[in-house]
Design a protein with these regions (language model features):
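Catalytic machinery of carbohydrate-active enzymes
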Residues: 176
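Small-residue-centered hinge/linker elements
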Residues: 1-72, 80-86, 90-171
Length: 177
């Protein structure tokens, strides 16, 4: 049994987790080790997660997919397996949920702070910028995103959502709706 409990993050140091974390940087090599261990005939992945990073979820999903190609993978869902928790589960051969498991929440979102008003109006900070191209300061918190940048972010989120729904559709053998 491999326990995957907590927020899904890329790195234990990334600051997104509010406690225990499922770090793709740890989980992926662990699953590869289980895949290569001839004494392990199947893997039960116990998932208890509200989700987290879409990127980290994709990395773990790929590792589960590689593992599944060599031996059976069974997901056992705990209290919740939502969003990224479901993402990392959907590639398994079998998924079992408790009657009270909260699961699903198939979607992604992005949240980007704009603290420019706080910095300039409240704190009186001014910013001078020197950049090498028009996207060099993309994502700075010292100004709001412009229309082109917002469209780029929207497209990125939409691509991520389409990938997520395709993973679920393929893994569970159901149509995307």
């Amino acid at each position: 049994v491999y326990y995957a409990y907590g927020d899904i993050v890329s790195d234990a140091e990334d600051g997104m987790s509010q406690g225990s974390a499922i770090c793709s940087g740890n989980v992926v090599p662990d699953l590869e080790e289980l895949m290569d261990d001839d004494d392990v005939k199947a893997v039960v992945l116990r998932v208890n997660s509200p989700g987290g990073s879409a990127y980290a979820s994709e990395q773990i999903w790929r590792a589960v997919t590689r593992l599944k190609a060599k031996k059976p993978v069974v997901v056992s869902m705990g209290t919740y397996a939502a969003s990224g928790g479901y993402y990392i589960s959907c590639a398994a051969n079998y998924i079992y949920a408790e009657p009270t498991t909260l699961t699903g929440s198939i979607g992604i979102f992005g949240m980007f702070p704009d603290v420019s008003g706080l910095l300039t109006d409240k704190l009186g900070l001014k910013f001078d910028q020197v950049k090498t191209n028009r996207y060099s300061n993309f994502g700075t918190t010292s100004r709001p995103f412009n229309e082109e940048e917002m469209q780029y972010l929207t497209n990125m989120i939409d691509r991520g959502y389409k990938t997520f729904t395709k993973r679920v559709s393929d893994g569970r053998k159901i149509p995307v709706e």
